[in-house]
Amino acid sequence: MIVKPMVRNNICLNAHPQGCKKGVEDQIEYTKKRITAEVKAGAKAPKNVLVLGCSNGYGLASRITAAFGYGAATIGVSFEKAGSETKYGTPGWYNNLAFDEAAKREGL
């Protein structure tokens, strides 16, 4: 399906899967670059993290920081909808897919 922007009153109503993936990858790279010396030296860090509302905003940022900054195992909870033949998925759906793919690659 070709993704065409749907804008109503300056608000974009749909999401582009590749754009969401790129956004998540950028956040992951930013987090990896900013790991402090304390974390690298083995300072106290969370081992398991539950994030409610993990698909966008602070929740996604928290999950990325816990997983890619501290190496914690994460569980994310969110309510998102997948795309279909006639409708696009929610941005959080695509963000969660991108996070899961990146975490799997890193062995998290």
For each predicted feature, which ranges?
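Non-catalytic terminal and boundary segments that flank Rossmann-like NAD(P)-dependent oxidoreductase
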Residues: 1-51, 81-82, 101-107
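Canonical Rossmann dinucleotide-binding motif of NAD(H)/NADP(H)-dependent dehydrogenases/reductases
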Residues: 35, 40-79
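Glycine-rich phosphate-binding loop and adjoining beta1-alpha1-beta2 segment
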Residues: 71-108
